[in-house]
Regions:
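Alpha/beta enzyme core
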Residues: 1-75, 81-97, 143-145, 149-162
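The DNA-recognition helices of helix-turn-helix-type DNA-binding domains
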Residues: 32, 106, 140
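C-terminal helical cap(s) of enzyme catalytic domains, especially alpha/beta-barrels
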Residues: 36-51, 104-127
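Gly/Ser/Thr-rich helix-start
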Residues: 79-80, 136
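Short Gly/Pro-enriched loop/turn and capping motifs at secondary-structure junctions
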Residues: 80-82, 103-104
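Helical hairpin unit composed of two closely spaced alpha helices linked by a short loop
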Residues: 96-106
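Short hairpin/turn module used for nucleic-acid contact or packing/dimerization
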Residues: 110-162
Length: 162
């Protein structure tokens, strides 16, 4: 089931989908993004492509859902533009990642570069299989799960070591 990030309680929704028989979820489906042309004073289509900066919500929810809803496969999507971003999603708990924008911008041959980045990182870290590190940094596995929780910006930085 492909989900939008506009739901209020994504872990609860994913758990209900799992209980109803869903085997997996995609976090996230990117919605149509409208824009306004202020010179022509009319609605126009916004950027159809994701940016690498959109990865944060994808990582956050993969980390939370993988910790709270065992037994469902998670595909991370949105903001994945390179091998490092794919690794972040896998470390957060995603089983797989999906890419689209980078294929349009760099072509299908870029997949080999992403795979090479992942394989190189795995070799340096001593991993032989993705299953060895999948979810290693999900909300249940990190010292401070507050990194995944919704919190005020200033509260986080007030407690951060400088």
């Amino acid at each position: 089931v492909k989900l939008s990030k506009s739901f209020a309680n994504i872990p609860s929704l994913v758990d209900k989908l799992r209980a109803a028989g869903a085997k997996g979820v995609v976090l996230f489906n990117r919605s149509y993004q409208p824009d306004i042309d202020i010179d022509k004073v009319q609605m126009v289509a916004g950027d159809v492509f994701t940016s690498a900066g959109e990865i944060s919500d994808t990582i956050r929810h993969a980390g939370i859902v993988s910790a709270l809803v065992p037994g469902i496969s998670i595909a991370s999507s949105t903001g994945i533009h390179d091998g490092e971003a794919a690794l972040k999603c896998l470390l957060a708990g995603a089983h797989v990642t999906q890419i689209c924008t980078v294929l349009y911008k760099k072509g299908p041959q870029f997949v080999a570069e992403m795979i090479a980045t992942i394989e190189s990182w795995m070799q340096v870290k001593g991993y032989y299989s993705v299953s060895e590190f999948r979810g290693k940094l999900n909300a249940a596995s990190v010292k401070s799960a507050t990194m995944y929780e919704r919190m005020q910006f200033m509260k986080y930085f007030a407690n951060k070591d400088n």
